């Protein structure tokens, strides 16, 4: 028996806990920002725009008493405009299938019909913790108003517990971890203690480029795009990464590239800097644009993309 196996057994004998936690909610309630703060590192993309998360991202946080394996899901789509949205909703449902705890995120002082749609998808026999996010908003700073809002939402579903946080500012994140911990099963850790995600460097590079697309383009255009890593080469002291951005129309390609290529250059530069920080190495990044008409309704193609 090696030392890691022995120590893992000692942890389990001492009541160590480890389990899966799904983070769910309607689009744009701050799920990805919350997960990034929970694990202490940015691995899930964030944006003020809805539906920035398309793939389930697994983040891992480990301390001396528990290991939390968080699954960040796409926002549940109530507008089924195409096959892509249907696939995103399927991702949410699949993520809920094998978890030990569900964290249901809502925006402070704003509970909508879209939130209720998500509630109806939640498993009946899995503990669900209500998390009221964005308590830094002015309307949520009134303690009594916030308490009344939490009571209103708790009346909609049989929640195991509730917590109010500000994912943006990292407020009450430690409290939330302690709230989740008792609902995790006693188990040895599933991952090494220094591991923060099970996603590959290729996947993280793709997500970084997607985040920049959402940041620098208009309200609708990023939803008509997909990002593919065509090549990822790791050398001594340098990662060479080649990424294609897929769009539906030539007109979208022109918008993405921008006048004189300035917009694409800005997106590429900021993405490269973020990758160098995340991978702790120099990065050569090449980003270009491809046109494939109707890709968001092509079910076979979506499967090839892993969506």
UniProtKB/Swiss-Prot annotation:
Region described as G1: spans on this chain: 25-32
Record's subcellular location: Cytoplasm; Cell inner membrane
One Pfam match: KH_2
Domain Era-type G stretches: 17-186
Region (G4): 133-136
Binding sites annotated in the UniProt record for GTP: 25-32, 72-76, 133-136
Function noted in UniProt: An essential GTPase that binds both GDP and GTP, with rapid nucleotide exchange. Plays a role in 16S rRNA processing and 30S ribosomal subunit biogenesis and possibly also in cell cycle regulation and energy metabolism.
Protein name, UniProt field: GTPase Era
Organism phylogeny: Bacteria, Pseudomonadati, Pseudomonadota, Betaproteobacteria, Neisseriales
Name of the encoding gene: era
């Amino acid at each position: 028996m090696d030392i890691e196996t022995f120590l893992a057994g000692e942890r389990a004998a001492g009541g160590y806990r480890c389990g899966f936690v799904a983070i769910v909610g309607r689009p744009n309630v701050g799920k990805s920002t919350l997960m990034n703060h929970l694990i202490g590192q940015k691995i899930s993309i964030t944006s003020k725009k809805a539906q920035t998360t398309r793939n389930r991202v697994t983040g891992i946080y480990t301390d001396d008493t528990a290991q939390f394996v968080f699954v960040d899901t796409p926002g549940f789509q109530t507008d089924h405009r195409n096959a892509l949205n249907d696939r995103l909703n399927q991702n949410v449902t699949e993520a809920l299938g094998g978890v030990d705890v569900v964290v249901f995120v809502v925006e402070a002082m704003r509970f909508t019909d879209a939130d209720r749609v998500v509630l109806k998808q939640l498993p009946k026999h899995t503990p669900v913790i209500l998390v009221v996010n964005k308590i830094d908003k002015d309307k949520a700073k009134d303690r009594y108003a916030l308490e009344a809002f939490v009571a209103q939402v708790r009346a909609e579903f049989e929640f195991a517990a509730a917590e109010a946080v500000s994912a943006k500012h990292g407020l009450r994140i430690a409290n939330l971890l302690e709230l989740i911990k008792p609902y995790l099963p006693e188990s040895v850790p599933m991952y090494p203690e220094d591991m923060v995600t099970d996603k590959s460097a290729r996947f993280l590079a793709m997500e970084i480029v997607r985040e920049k697309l959402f940041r620098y383009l208009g309200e609708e255009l990023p939803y008509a795009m997909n990002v593919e890593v065509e090549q990822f080469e790791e050398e001594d002291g340098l990662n060479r990464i080649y990424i294609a951005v897929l769009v539906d129309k030539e007109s979208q390609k022109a918008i993405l590239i921008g006048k004189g290529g300035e917009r694409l250059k800005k997106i590429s530069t900021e993405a490269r800097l973020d990758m160098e920080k995340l991978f702790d190495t120099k990065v050569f990044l090449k980003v270009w644009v491809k046109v494939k008409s109707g890709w968001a309704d092509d079910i076979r193609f979506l499967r090839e993309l892993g969506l």
